[in-house]
Amino acid sequence: MPFEPGDGRRSVSPLSTGRASPALRAPRRVEDAVAQKDKTTRRYATAIDRALSSFDSAQQEWADYIAFLARLLKALHPPPPALEYLPHAQSVALRLAQCLNPALPSGVHQKALDVYATIFSFLPPPSLGQTLHVYLPGLVPVLSFASLSVRPIFYSVIEDHILKLDSEHIRPATKSLILSLLPGIEDETSEDFDRAFRILNVLRKTSSRDIDDGPDAEGRDGYFWQCFFLAVITNPSRRQGALAFLTRKLPNFTPSETSPDSSQVEDRTLPLAAQAAINPEPGLLVRCFAAGLQDSQILVQRGFLDLLVTHLPLHSPVFRNHVRSKDMVLITTAAASCVLRRDMSLNRRLWSWFLGP
């Protein structure tokens, strides 16, 4: 029986969505209103729609993708003055994502990234930030299959446009951006390792800067680390690259040497950066390490055991004052399961963590 107005029964719907950050998506009706703003904008929207209609996914060779992208790029130039939102943005993003299919040659990928860069260049930063969720799904997997000629263009798109946005626009996309950049630092000997690592570190500072607190400072990168831990937990294929970043940038959770007694370690003995990394959910750090210790690749297990020994010893205040008992059981069980590998290098690191220095 449906509820009647005034029958005294309360609705089970929540009063709010509980979001900590605002919903930044631009409604479709806003884009439609922009498209109908004036004659120039309507003509611009018609040209884009005509270029999109020339895309036929059922009967295309790779050369046809190049021709389609050239037509789309021609339709995008020049944009009308004071353009706020790109007309038919969702359709454009869909076609660009299809042009970034791993089965297509690198020439198509380069052309598609050029179109992304063109769109991002003439959209105002607030508008790009509000519509970033439309374009990002096509960009996220690029580094996992990109050739050496495509990677610099991808890095330029991230550096020149996305990382220039305010932190309030980058925060909702932080985890996706982390996952998109981790393949670039999997091989520490690759020629683009330094650039990918630098971009990821800039993302750490940009996304973690408090919106109202001014410049970045120590202890304000907790939001980035929480997203990073989630990325490691949910994406086994990205853990090799994540390990390279953790080895260089993870805060040390070892108690201060000046503490009077290691059995009475207080919160203040943790550095500010370490306190930020476990706020508001210290269990994410534990589950991140547990996921790495149970990875199918022995090199990943070895790397996370090294991090346990150097950054997260058993006498750390994290285990004593922050995590729950079931989280402690989880990471101990995950570490102990490494002996099933019957690998001496893993066993040696495990005993170092259990027995201490």
PLM regions and their residue ranges:
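HEAT-repeat alpha-solenoid elements in large eukaryotic scaffold proteins
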Residues: 18-29, 55-79, 89-96, 104-120, ...
